[in-house]
UniProtKB/Swiss-Prot annotation:
This is Hydroxylamine reductase. Pfam families: Prismane (PF03063). GO terms for cellular component: cytoplasm. It comes from Actinobacillus pleuropneumoniae serotype 7 (strain AP76). Its cofactor is [2Fe-2S] cluster; hybrid [4Fe-2O-2S] cluster. One of its GO terms (biological process) is response to hydrogen peroxide. The gene is hcp. InterPro entries: HCP/CODH, Hydroxylam_reduct, Prismane-like_a/b-sand, Prismane-like_sf, Prismane_a-bundle. Its main location: cytoplasm. HAMAP family: Hydroxylam_reduct (MF_00069).
Amino acid sequence: MYCVQCEQTMVTPMGNGCSFGQGMCGKTAETSDLQDLLIACLHSLSAWALKAREHGIINHDADNFAPRAFFATLTNVNFDSNRIVGYAQQAIIYRNELIKAISEVEPNPELNHPLAYIELKGISIDQLAEQAKEFALDTDRAEIGEEVHGVRLLALYGLKGAAAYLEHAYVLGKFDNDLYVEYHGFMAWLGTKPRDLNELLEKSLAIGSMNFKVMAMLDAGETETFGNPVPATVNIRPVKGKCILISGHDLKDLKELLEQTEGKGINVYTHGEMLPAHGYPELKKYKHLVGNYGSGWQNQQKEFARFPGAIVMTSNCLIDPNVGDYADRIFTCNIVGWPGVVHLEKHNFAPVIEKALECDGFPYTELEHYITVGFGRKTLIDASDAVIDLVKAGKLSHVFVIGGCDGDKEERHYYTDLAYALPKDTAVLTLGCGKYRFNKLDFGTIDGGLPRLLDAGQCNDTYSAIMLAVTLSQKLGIGLNELPLSIVLSWFEQKAIIVLLTLLALGVKNVYSGPSKPAFLNDNVMNLLHEKFGLSGLTTPEQDFGHIINK
C-alpha cells in the first residue's frame, strides 16, 4: 500500500504516506492497491478513447464511465474491494469495445502507450491485489526524485477532483465532448508517467483551466434543474418524527428522495455538503425537507450514531459506519461503497424509507436555531453593485473567502479563530464543508444590510466566488489580484486540490492554504509554488491577517 492523497495521511521521519495494512481513512491496503490497478486500467481506456476519436468514434458510455470510476478512488468514497474490481473489469470491457470499433476502420490498430494493452491477471481479489503492486504510485519515486514524483501526483489528484465534478455534472444531464477529450488527454498522458517537472506544472495548471469549464457546466446543471439559489434560513435543530439523513453532494439524489418520501410522514434532513440544497427553489419547496443535521463529515461516527433514522451517502465523505454501530441503517448509492453496507441502485430509496419507518425518529422538537444559506452565483453577482458601493463608502474594507474541506486536526480551529476575529467591516464568503468551523456563529451585517457571512454553497461553488470576483474586477476596472479579496483555503482531499489548481490557472495569487502542506509535495516544490503564485501556508490568524491586509 502507498497512498498519500489526503491531508490526514501519515507523515513520519521515515517517509510520508499510508503504507501499512490500513490507511488513516480506514481504507485497507488491499482496496488501496486495487484502486491503483483501476487507475492503470483507466489510463488505458482514456488512451484508446483518444485514438477512437481520430476516427470519429465516440463511446458515450465509456466517456461517462471513465471519470465516474476515477471518482471512486477519491478519499472517503469507496472502500469496497469488489466494487473497485468491478470498475477495473468494466474499464477493460469498454477499452476492448473501443479497440474493436477502431479495428473496423483501421485493421490491427496499434497504440504507443505503456498501458495500451494492460489485462487483468485473474478474477479473484487475491490475484488482482498481487497484480496491483506493479502499479503502485511510488514505483519510480527513488529514480525520478521527490519533486517530479510530487508534482505528478499533484496533477493526478487534481484530475481526480475534476473527474468528480464531471460526474456530478453528467448526473444532471450535462456533457461536453470537448471537455471529455481534454479529460482523456490528461488521463492518458499521466499513464505514461511523465518526468519533466516544467511540463508537469504546466499540465497541472491546464487541468485547473479545464476544471473551471467543468465547474461552469456543473453550475449550469444545478441551476437549470433546481433554480438559482436564493438566501434562505435553515433550521439546524431536530423536529419530532421519523427521519432520513442524506449526505454527500448529489442534489439529484436528494430530489428523488424528497419525491419518494412525500406524504409518508418522514422528515428529511441534509448533512455536510448537502446543506446548500435549502437555497434551491426546486428543493426547498418540499415541506418535509425540515433542516440540516450535524456538522463536518469527520464527526459523523458520533452524530450518525445519535441520529434516530436512516442515512444515505450519495458521494464523499464516508467513514467506517461500524464504529458507531449504525451500519444496518446507512445506505450508499452512486460510486460510494463500504463492505456489508446496502448499496442502492437506480434511485430506489424504498429500503431507506422502510428503515426510517422502523426507527424511532426524534421524540420531540427542539428549540429552533437558524442559519442562512443560498448566496449562489446569481445572488452574489446581483449584489456586486451594493458591494462596490459599500467599498467606496469605506464600510466594507475586505472580503475573505474562507472555505474548502473540513477535517480532524486540531489546527483546523485556525479557521474558526480567523473568521471570528476579522474586523466588523469585513465579510466572509464561505463554501464547502469547511464552513462548519464557523457557520453557526452570528456575524451580523454591514451597514444593516449585507450579511457578513455569505454561504456560497458546496466546494464546486468556488465557481460562484470566482464569478463574483470577475464581476467586481470588471466593474472596478482592476485586476483580480488588486481586489480587496483574499482566499484562505482548507484542504483535505482531491476536490480541494483541483479547486486550488483552478485558482492558480486563473492567475489568482497569494492564496493561503492549510492546515498543513500536502504530504506529497516537499519543501522545494512548495517554495516553487510560493515564488510563482504566492501560495502560502498558514501561521497564526493574527499574523496571516496582518500579511493579507498589508499587501
